[in-house]
Design a protein with these regions (language model features):
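Glycine-rich, proline-tolerant flexible connector loops at the mouths of alpha/beta enzymes
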Residues: 4-30, 73, 139-150
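Conserved, mostly hydrophobic/aromatic
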Residues: 5, 61, 96, 130, ...
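Hydrophobic faces of well-ordered beta-strands that scaffold small-molecule active sites
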Residues: 5-7, 46-50, 69-71, 94-98, ...
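Glycine-rich phosphate-binding active-site loops on the catalytic face of alpha/beta enzymes
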Residues: 12, 60-81, 142-147, 170-206
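Glycine/small-residue-rich loop that forms an oxyanion/phosphate-binding "nest" at active or ligand-binding sites
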Residues: 19-89
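Charged helix-capping and loop-helix junction motifs
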Residues: 21-34, 119-124, 150-158
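Catalytic cores of alpha/beta
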Residues: 37-65, 155-192
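Conserved anion-binding
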Residues: 62, 66-140, 144-145
Length: 230
């Protein structure tokens, strides 16, 4: 019942070997190996991101099974890189990711490099620039609300969606059904993404999907199907 899965590699040391040598466990020591193993078992659209700095990084992730590749810091700091990527792989394969920190009422700044580097950019201007450079979608994340489950930053999401023509995915703060309903009803966002609600709430995917449909939100209906255990 998930429409799409976004995997963002936010590890800093790039060490993936967990030193587990069980008989029935294949140890995976690189992010590409993890991606390949995951995509082999996944039957939904898959977006992979994190650590993307070169055209080869994009190609590697697409070859690993990604339908789309999310790019954050490299896209913000090097618009020409995104242009080259769009020319080679097509805009439909590229998601530009924006991490925005709220500085005051209706005032945000784009940060990169794990939220450490201030860019001086407004997320609206950044989104427009990324769209012009060739991004097929924009993923906008609220740093302030990330992991808080206190609701989406609707002013931020609304401002970004109004500034571009490409689809916008909102991220950061989704913790209850009402948070999703409010954001869908009060913004023009194309999709909403979340993590904690799905990781720590029993049957969250099915229940959220069902509740949104019941409340009239236009999304694909939930369905129960046979599931294979991997």
């Amino acid at each position: 019942n998930v429409d799409e899965l976004i995997i963002l590699d936010i590890s800093r040391e790039r060490k993936y070997d967990i030193n587990r040598e069980d008989l029935n466990y294949q140890n995976l020591d690189s992010i590409l190996a993890i991606f390949k193993d995951f995509s082999r078992k996944s039957f939904m659209p898959l977006t992979l991101g994190g650590g993307v700095k070169t055209l080869s990084d994009i190609e590697d992730r697409l070859r690993a099974g990604a339908d789309k590749v999310a790019i954050n810091s490299a896209a913000i700091h090097q618009p020409d890189f995104l242009e080259k990527a769009a020319g080679r792989f097509g805009s439909q394969a590229l998601v530009a990711s924006i991490d925005a920190l709220e500085l005051g009422t209706d005032c945000w700044e784009v940060f990169t490099d794990f939220g450490k580097t201030a860019t001086g950019l407004n997320p609206l201007n950044a989104a427009q620039r990324l769209e012009s450079a060739g991004a097929g979608e924009i993923l906008v994340n609220s740093i302030n609300r990330d992991g808080q489950c206190q609701g989406f930053d609707m002013p931020l999401i609304s401002a970004v969606t109004e500034s571009v023509d490409v689809p916008v995915i909102g991220l950061g703060g989704g913790g209850t059904t009402q948070h999703f309903v409010e954001c869908f009803e009060n913004t023009k966002v194309s999709a909403l993404a979340a993590s904690n609600i799905f990781q720590y709430t029993e049957q969250a995917v099915f229940n959220l999907n069902h509740e949104l449909n019941t409340l009239g939100i236009n999304i694909r209906p939930a369905a129960i199907s046979n599931m294979e255990t991997f």
